[in-house]
Amino acid sequence: MVGPAMPAVTIHELRKRFPRTTALDGLSFTVQAGEVVGLLGANGAGKTTTLHILLGLILPSAGRVEVFGQAPRAHRKAALRRVGFASPEALMDWRLTVAENLRVFAGLYDVPREAVPRMIERFELDPMADQPFGELSLGQQTRAGLARALLHDPDLLVLDEPTASLDPDIADKTRQLLLRVRRERGLAILYSSHNMTEVEDVCDRVVFVHHGRVVAEGTPLAVSRQVLGSDALDAASMEEVFLKISRDGVA
């Protein structure tokens, strides 16, 4: 008999204290393999701190974090080989060309160099492959950042505001690209965003965080009904959920 699949992400009673503030106060949630989960909340809710702990960039004060059953700090190389990360900053060298950036990253992860031109073609980066990353538009930088994040074929993609500062048309194209990647690869995605329309389109479940705690969790429809008591779900209702939780802090 085959047992249940191991969660892609397990976060249990996570706490993080800084000298003047408590960023996380008993945060708990999971992301199952192949699932897309939105991590939502106002600025200062604890989303970025959660992602930094998950990526092994900072240590928690207490609690447990696992990526496919491994602690990111204790097994950093093994755990993070299974993780791709993309954010507006994209972790790219702005002086290098797109192709050079991808080749550097391929070398770090022992990815065959021939994977780079394939990824450039797949993300429609051919026209700007030989341009310095810093000269690209925001939409092009976002695509290049996603290409870098997926180059080593991860099982989990962590996205921090992937469409922030993009105009609506480019944001929609980026969203469609993410949906295509999800369909093709079946990878788990942890998706931090302020864009509620985007969340509805992309996420299977949402986790709302307020002052370092989970205050609502479930499908977008379930959370909307829990918070607003409504029977309908549309973009406006999810915006209302976000505003109510940001204002009141409790569902």
Q: What kind of region is each of these model predictions?
A:
Residues 217-218:
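ABC ATPase "signature
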Residues 172-185:
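Helical segment within the ABC ATPase nucleotide-binding domain
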Residues 153:
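Conserved catalytic motifs of ABC-family nucleotide-binding domains
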